[in-house]
Amino acid sequence: MVLCFPLLLLLLVLWGPVCLLHAWPKHLTRAHWFEIQHIQPSPLQCNRAMSGINNYTQHCKHQNTFLHDSFQNVAAVCDLLSIICKNRQHNCHQSSKPVNMTDCRLTSGKYPQCRYSTAAQYKFFIVACDPPQKSDPPYKLVPVHLDSIL
């Protein structure tokens, strides 16, 4: 029993930061957090665009993709045929056409001085969708996770 406690403590220390990286601010719905992280109708330089996201989480996010489209258009993808997500769930949907997007990758810095590379892309995307929460827009399904870029 004594040997188990240090091992448990080590696991908690190692897994704690991983869990924090995937959490979203609890005062936001998952759809609203998706919109903040991934919807940017007009292209912005990544250092500027990422500062808003990093201010919520208080750390430098390693990678992020901004879709240059409206939330309404991205939410419409949720009405397309369901496909299997990376996590094996069946709530993902692929865009029917490519969209302009910006890929931001952390190159240096420590919060709040995060520095990113900026790469313009024109690709398809896959989003995970869930039923809306009370304060979400009134769609049948809303995007909650950017699962992949194709």
From Swiss-Prot:
Residues given in the record as substrate binding sites: 61-65, 86, 105
Site residues by UniProt (Critical for catalytic activity): 61
Keywords annotated in UniProt: Antibiotic, Antimicrobial, Disulfide bond, Endonuclease, Glycoprotein, Hydrolase, Lysosome, Nuclease, Secreted, Signal
N-terminal signal peptide: 1-23
Main location class: secreted
E.C. numbers: 3.1.27.-
Highest rank taxon of the organism: Eukaryota
SMART domains the UniProt entry points to: RNAse_Pc
Any one Gene Ontology molecular-function term assigned to this protein's record: nucleic acid binding
One annotated GO biological process: antibacterial humoral response
Active site: 38, 145
Any one GO CC term of the record: lysosome
Disulfide bridge positions per record: 46-104, 60-114, 78-129, 85-92
UniProt keyword Signal present: yes
Task performed by this protein: Ribonuclease which shows a preference for the pyrimidines uridine and cytosine. Has potent antibacterial activity against a range of Gram-positive and Gram-negative bacteria, including P.aeruginosa, A.baumanii, M.luteus, S.aureus, E.faecalis, E.faecium, S.saprophyticus and E.coli. Causes loss of bacterial membrane integrity, and also promotes agglutination of Gram-negative bacteria. Probably contributes to urinary tract sterility. Bactericidal activity is independent of RNase activity.
Record text on subunit structure and interactions: Interacts (via N-terminus) with bacterial lipopolysaccharide (LPS).
Family per record: Belongs to the pancreatic ribonuclease family.
Protein known as: Ribonuclease K6
